[in-house]
Amino acid sequence: MAKAGVMTLSHVDRMNLRTWTMAIACCLLSFVNIVVFSVAAHFPGIGFPCYYPRIIDFDNMNLTMYNAIHHLTPQLFLDPVQLIVYVIFTELIFFCVLSYYIVCWVQIYFRSEHGTQVNQSTRDINFMGDSATCFTFVLTMDTFQIFLLSLSFRLPSMVAFSKCMYFMCLTAFVVTLVTHYESRERSAFALSKIHPKLQGTIRYRTAVVNLTQLILGFATMVLAMSLALGFGNSFFVKTAHVVFGAMVAFAIVACVYFSIIESVLSRYMKVQFGYHIGTILGVCGAMYPIIRYEALNASSYARDINIGITVLLLLCVAFSVIRTVRFLLRRNKRYRALALDNEEIRALRSDAE
């Protein structure tokens, strides 16, 4: 029998908790699958046609060369060491997200007191990351696995397509994890109604959001490189022009995401620096092949490429400074003036008169 003032699990809570448990189990299976897949891809004779990190031979790269039909034309991409580090780091972030979901599930599933409000568990699940968000995370991991498989088969068009799908799924996961499909006011109201024992877990949620934004920022540069790889091997274009096109694509996508963070997402969560750090790391990752390989460094286009990379880096740093300044200003704001045209204020004034 329930204690006085304490609610038991309702039918809605039980159904949502079961669905959420199944979603987290699917996340766990997908994570194990992608880890086993990425490890097996490093060993020959298991079924992978090529060693996926070596999709580009920088020694044969020529910026003045046009696309060679029916041959893989080298384009600007991550070198083997960078690609392996990128895969490992991405999977570590996936592990952190999965750990966050498991911690939330343990705290909600095994707690003795379910709260004093109706459907308290449903409220908590929706705020911490509901079943739809979990399934979006599953799609994110699955599309990343398809991206690695495309690299192994050395299919440039498929690499570009799978990277676009992964980028869109990761974007959807980040946005839904921040907004909960709700307005800022409803999200703030849901935060005030969660179970008291989950207050400390909110800090982990902030860290998870920033970590996923970090890989989203780096994935922006990988997306631009993947599009360049697919476009440069599908049309009769010069390699140097494809490199410049990748820079423009990165600048456009990054500016759009920076604007969304500043105008929309920052209202839901104050601490959001992950995407800014990720884009800076992505630009630095693009610098490494240009500096390391003589075929790129000695080209007549090297100066223009270096200028373009520098502009991209300054762009990311500028938006990072803007985010930092806005965060500090919002943090130091002690109060907010009430709007003079508020209906409640007008009603109070009329009553006073």
Swiss-Prot record:
<dbReference type="InterPro" id="IPR000785">
    <property type="entry name" value="Herpes_glycop_M"/>
</dbReference>
<keyword id="KW-0261">Viral envelope protein</keyword>
<comment type="function">
    <text>Envelope glycoprotein important for virion assembly and egress. Plays a role in the correct incorporation of gH-gL into virion membrane. Directs the glycoprotein N (gN) to the host trans-Golgi network.</text>
</comment>
<feature type="transmembrane region" description="Helical">
    <location>
        <begin position="83"/>
        <end position="103"/>
    </location>
</feature>
<dbReference type="GO" id="GO:0016020">
    <property type="term" value="C:membrane"/>
</dbReference>
<protein>
    <recommendedName>
        <fullName>Envelope glycoprotein M</fullName>
    </recommendedName>
</protein>
<feature type="topological domain" description="Virion surface">
    <location>
        <begin position="232"/>
        <end position="240"/>
    </location>
</feature>
<feature type="topological domain" description="Intravirion">
    <location>
        <begin position="179"/>
        <end position="210"/>
    </location>
</feature>
<feature type="topological domain" description="Intravirion">
    <location>
        <begin position="326"/>
        <end position="353"/>
    </location>
</feature>
<keyword id="KW-1048">Host nucleus</keyword>
<feature type="topological domain" description="Intravirion">
    <location>
        <begin position="1"/>
        <end position="27"/>
    </location>
</feature>
<dbReference type="GO" id="GO:0044175">
    <property type="term" value="C:host cell endosome membrane"/>
</dbReference>
<dbReference type="Pfam" id="PF01528">
    <property type="entry name" value="Herpes_glycop"/>
</dbReference>
<keyword id="KW-0325">Glycoprotein</keyword>
<dbReference type="GO" id="GO:0044177">
    <property type="term" value="C:host cell Golgi apparatus"/>
</dbReference>
<keyword id="KW-1043">Host membrane</keyword>
<feature type="topological domain" description="Virion surface">
    <location>
        <begin position="292"/>
        <end position="304"/>
    </location>
</feature>
<dbReference type="GO" id="GO:0055036">
    <property type="term" value="C:virion membrane"/>
</dbReference>
<keyword id="KW-1133">Transmembrane helix</keyword>
<keyword id="KW-0946">Virion</keyword>
<feature type="transmembrane region" description="Helical">
    <location>
        <begin position="158"/>
        <end position="178"/>
    </location>
</feature>
<feature type="topological domain" description="Virion surface">
    <location>
        <begin position="154"/>
        <end position="157"/>
    </location>
</feature>
<feature type="topological domain" description="Virion surface">
    <location>
        <begin position="49"/>
        <end position="82"/>
    </location>
</feature>
<keyword id="KW-1015">Disulfide bond</keyword>
<feature type="transmembrane region" description="Helical">
    <location>
        <begin position="28"/>
        <end position="48"/>
    </location>
</feature>
<comment type="subunit">
    <text>Interacts (via N-terminus) with gN (via N-terminus). The gM-gN heterodimer forms the gCII complex.</text>
</comment>
<feature type="transmembrane region" description="Helical">
    <location>
        <begin position="305"/>
        <end position="325"/>
    </location>
</feature>
<feature type="topological domain" description="Intravirion">
    <location>
        <begin position="262"/>
        <end position="270"/>
    </location>
</feature>
<feature type="topological domain" description="Intravirion">
    <location>
        <begin position="104"/>
        <end position="132"/>
    </location>
</feature>
<feature type="transmembrane region" description="Helical">
    <location>
        <begin position="271"/>
        <end position="291"/>
    </location>
</feature>
<comment type="similarity">
    <text>Belongs to the herpesviridae glycoprotein M family.</text>
</comment>
<keyword id="KW-1039">Host endosome</keyword>
<dbReference type="GO" id="GO:0044201">
    <property type="term" value="C:host cell nuclear inner membrane"/>
</dbReference>
<feature type="transmembrane region" description="Helical">
    <location>
        <begin position="211"/>
        <end position="231"/>
    </location>
</feature>
<keyword id="KW-0472">Membrane</keyword>
<keyword id="KW-0812">Transmembrane</keyword>
<keyword id="KW-1040">Host Golgi apparatus</keyword>
<feature type="transmembrane region" description="Helical">
    <location>
        <begin position="133"/>
        <end position="153"/>
    </location>
</feature>
<feature type="transmembrane region" description="Helical">
    <location>
        <begin position="241"/>
        <end position="261"/>
    </location>
</feature>
<dbReference type="GO" id="GO:0019031">
    <property type="term" value="C:viral envelope"/>
</dbReference>
